[in-house]
């Protein structure tokens, strides 16, 4: 499993928990994030299967010949918007260090022929990523649109799954809250096994 932009390692830890025989590699360009990730990895029961590297996706794809069966990412997603005065915050939230096209190119190079790529993005950015993957014949096979509440008109995030082989697309709407301060049954179900 490859976690692109691992941050503090939360997705990597979740993957190690859900896939007990998998090795997980987290990559990030921020040294403090990688150090925090490694600390979190050392404190977990899966530490022998977790690695973190300070390297960009652009560099990693050039040096690693492995194909991954699963790639996950919660990538930077703000495009052409006001950046922060903090370069760390800007890199974590904006596509200045990893564009949608670079993400698509890297995933195409590193994903095995039967592998899956999962990511979490705002709705508009997810549309742009789907378009970027067209060049590589990578298709969105599942999309879950996440809303804060059932009566909301706009999704706050899309959880997308991509595959190199064309298959049918599954589309769902899901909600985080049933009402203010009360998580939905779906949200409780998907987070029930996470040990964080």
List each language-model region with its residue ranges:
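Hydrophobic alpha-helix-in-membranes signature
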Residues: 74-75, 121
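Mobile active-site "lid"/loop adjacent to the S-adenosyl-L-methionine
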Residues: 75-102
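Short, catalytically relevant binding-site loops at active-site mouths
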Residues: 59-60, 77-79, 124-127, 149
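Conserved Class I SAM-dependent methyltransferase catalytic core
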Residues: 99-148
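SAM/dcSAM-binding transferase cores
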Residues: 151-196
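Conserved SAM/SAH cofactor-binding pocket of Class I
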Residues: 1-64, 70-73, 79-84
């Amino acid at each position: 499993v490859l976690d692109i932009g691992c941050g503090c390692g939360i997705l990597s830890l979740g993957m190690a928990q859900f896939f007990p025989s998998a090795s997980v590699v987290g990559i990030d360009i921020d040294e403090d994030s990688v150090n925090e990730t490694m600390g979190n990895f050392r404190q977990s029961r899966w530490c022998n299967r977790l690695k973190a590297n300070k390297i960009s996706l652009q560099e990693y794809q050039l040096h690693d010949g492995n194909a991954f069966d699963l790639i996950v990412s919660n990538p930077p997603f703000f495009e052409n918007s006001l950046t922060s005065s903090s370069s760390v915050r800007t890199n974590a939230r904006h596509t200045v260090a990893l564009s949608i096209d670079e993400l698509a190119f890297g995933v195409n190079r590193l994903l095995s022929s039967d592998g899956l790529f999962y990511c979490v993005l705002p709705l508009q950015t997810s549309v742009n990523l789907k378009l970027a993957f067209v060049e590589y014949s990578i298709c969105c096979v599942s999309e879950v649109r996440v809303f804060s509440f059932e009566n909301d008109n706009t999704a706050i995030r899309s959880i997308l799954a991509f595959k190199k082989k064309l298959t049918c697309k599954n589309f769902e709407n899901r909600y985080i809250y049933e009402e203010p301060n009360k998580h939905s049954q779906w949200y409780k179900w998907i987070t029930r096994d996470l040990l964080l």
